[in-house]
Amino acid sequence: MNFLSLFVLVPMVMLLGLWLAKGVKAVRGVMVVGSAALLALAIYLTIDFLGQRAAGNDAEMLYQASFTWFEPLKISYRTGVDGISVAMLLLSAIIVFTGTFASWRLNPNLKDYFLWFTLLSMGVFGFFISIDMFMMFMFYEIALIPMYLLIGVWGSGQKEYAAMKLTLMLMGGSAFLMVGIFGIFYGAGGETMNILDIANHTNGAHPIEFAQQCIWFPLTFIGFGVLGALFPFHTWSPDGHASAPTAVSMLHAGVLMKLGGYGCFRIAIFLMPEAANELNWIFLILTGISVVYGAMSACVQTDLKYINAYSSVSHCGLVLFGILMLTTSSTVGAVLQMLSHGLMTALFFALIGMIYGRTHTRNVNEMKGLMQIMPFLSVCFVIAGLANLGLPGLSGFVAEMTIFVGSFQNADTFHRVLTIMATCSIVVAAVYILRMVGRMLYGVCTDEHHKQLTDATWEERLAVICLIFAIAGLGLAPAWMSNLIDSSVAPIIETVKNAGPLVSSCNPFM
């Protein structure tokens, strides 16, 4: 059995264990063992991958395996990973592990909740190990379907509305994506769904005509971009985050939204380089709007989850922004931003859930003096805010600076003006983060109920500390992760840049 398949097999075993489990303790035990096993697999994979790269193995994808699943459409179960995939698998494993402890005391129906949560996790892991377009799409759908029930049943507020809105928007994106994938398949000769074969024009695949690329590129980019909160398709995100239970918000913002950026790079840009060079300016404008609009929208919110949700729109916009700049540095920064945002937004949502569970409010104006009442949670909240601001020594600084420096390497005025506009989001972020921290944590608490609140429990402390260590580790020692990502990004970006547009640029700003 292929090693990578364990990332799908372990969640399957977890599903069986949860189905057979009797009682809350058994359910928790299955989740702890399963999520710990996934984290151990991800750590081992990362170490072994780095070792193989150091030993000179420069293959595009490692640990490849395949078997034919549906011959008429050339669909196969194909697995393989590069540095980007390994980074995303590690992120996913960390958040599944910490999300398990963040949901420790969830009621009611903890068993059913973890069943759907595990199915969602399986879809995410399967997506990142797949190198067959259809298998990626299948796991993508597996990851989306549980979201409706997890929000609609275990959510809060306008949960039914938020669940339906999220499902309809993401399924609409899936429709674009399916058309784009089959367009790529038939445009490349209809012989293979293997991403590497299509990119390298092997095993019967031939180059996709430029005219076809200009049709399928926007469809696939929008299809994945909807999940990445691309403006103006982002409106599902704030409502979905605000209504989702804590661990679902963590996995949703921390990992699920990264499927969008990963898919845009892996399929849209990698397989259609000429169209990417020709049409990227359109989506650069949209992502630039996402970055600034998300940050400014966060400034006018008073609900903690909405603040973090709009902040996520801004940060995920920055991921797509870095990818579309088509430089090695900006793309490495975009992947680092996926990691950084995944960790810090998971930390934020975990802390918001813990605070809400005690105060029964998410309104910033209804909380004061929490630093004296819940010092552990408050200090962790400050750390999450500083990571969001891009404080040196934490993950946000490394990711954002790499994106901005890489973006500015484009010598033309259009790209540089957009980069300068995007950097303004850092200033705006300072407004909503510092205001939120100041109002919530300091001052004199006048609410008698709040004065009786307790600090974090042991399982909450474990989840939060794991995330903080990961954020600090990435910020203090980013070189190993940057090298891991660069080994996979650099050859792809070089290929894309060498392809160039096949017609004179249609960008009116160039």
Where are the predicted features?
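Cytoplasmic juxtamembrane regions at transmembrane-helix boundaries
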Residues: 101-116, 246, 448-459
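Central hydrophobic cores of alpha-helical transmembrane segments in multi-pass inner-membrane proteins
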Residues: 5-20, 34-45, 89-103, 120-122, ...
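Membrane-interface helix-loop-helix modules in multi-pass inner-membrane proteins
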Residues: 61-87, 133-136, 140-148, 389, ...
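Transmembrane helix-loop-helix hairpins at membrane boundaries of multipass inner-membrane proteins
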Residues: 2-3, 17-101, 105-115, 191-192, ...
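Cytoplasmic/organellar membrane-interface segments at the starts of transmembrane helices
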Residues: 374-376, 433-510
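Hydrophobic alpha-helical membrane-insertion segments
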Residues: 33-50, 170-182, 377, 381-389, ...
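Alpha-helical transmembrane segments and their helix-start/interface "positive-inside/aromatic belt" motifs
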Residues: 25-36, 161-171, 374-379, 458-466
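Hydrophobic transmembrane alpha-helices and their helix-loop junctions in integral membrane proteins
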Residues: 98-104, 122-134, 148-439
